A protein has these predicted regions:
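Flexible, glycine-rich beta-alpha linker
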Residues: 41, 111-113, 135-136, 157-176
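NAD(P)H-binding glycine-rich loop region in Rossmannoid oxidoreductase-like domains
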Residues: 45-85, 94-97
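Conserved Rossmann-fold NAD(P)-dependent oxidoreductase catalytic core, especially the SDR/UDP-sugar
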Residues: 3, 89-134
């Protein structure tokens, strides 16, 4: 990426997004774009469309997600699947419509089966049941991964999906 390229970091106030934002700044990237949830509700497709129309990002890093600990994942299952699917649909969809050069989607290792052997191999994805407590979140993240893969295969886009391992650090807002 060029140092002056317009890079939209969705979720730039969160744990991963803020680390990416800070790293890009330290490396000299000067045209970073971020919006707080208050400024841009990623669940609102029209708002996301208007944002992309106005900003025209060249690169998108999708680190935004509805996250929580074990208790929240157990109690608010519908919220986790619905909100994460909506965020992904809106951001990946507008990235495609606006011809971004590259999109980086951050998933989660919870997409792998509950009883996957260690170390986990990519090939075990979708081979056996997920951990029940975070299954809706995991299914949404699998959908995001498959959206990226499908856009790449059908349209030749450059969408990359990565699955960070368990994370903690500054700006972590999950609650157990």
């Amino acid at each position: 990426m060029e140092k002056t390229a317009k890079i939209y970091v969705a979720g730039h106030h969160g744990l991963v997004g803020s680390a990416i934002w800070n790293n890009l700044q330290q490396k000299g990237y000067t045209n970073l774009v971020g919006r707080s949830h208050k400024e841009l509700d990623l669940l609102d497709g029209q708002a996301v469309k208007e944002f992309f129309d106005e900003e025209q990002p060249q690169y998108v890093i999708l680190a935004a997600a509805h996250v929580g600990g074990i208790m929240a994942n157990s109690l608010y299952r519908a919220d986790f699947i619905y909100q994460n699917l909506q965020i992904q649909q809106n951001v990946i969809g507008e990235s495609f419509r606006h011809n971004v050069k590259k999109l980086l989607f951050l998933g989660s290792t919870c997409i792998y089966p509950r009883d996957a052997g260690q170390p986990m191999k990519e090939e075990v994805l979708l081979t056996s049941p997920l951990e029940y407590t975070n299954e809706p979140y995991a299914i949404a993240k699998i959908a995001g991964l498959k959206m990226c893969e499908s856009f790449n295969l059908q349209y030749g886009t450059n969408y990359i999906a990565v699955m960070p391992t368990n994370l903690y650090g500054p700006n972590d807002n999950s609650v157990s």
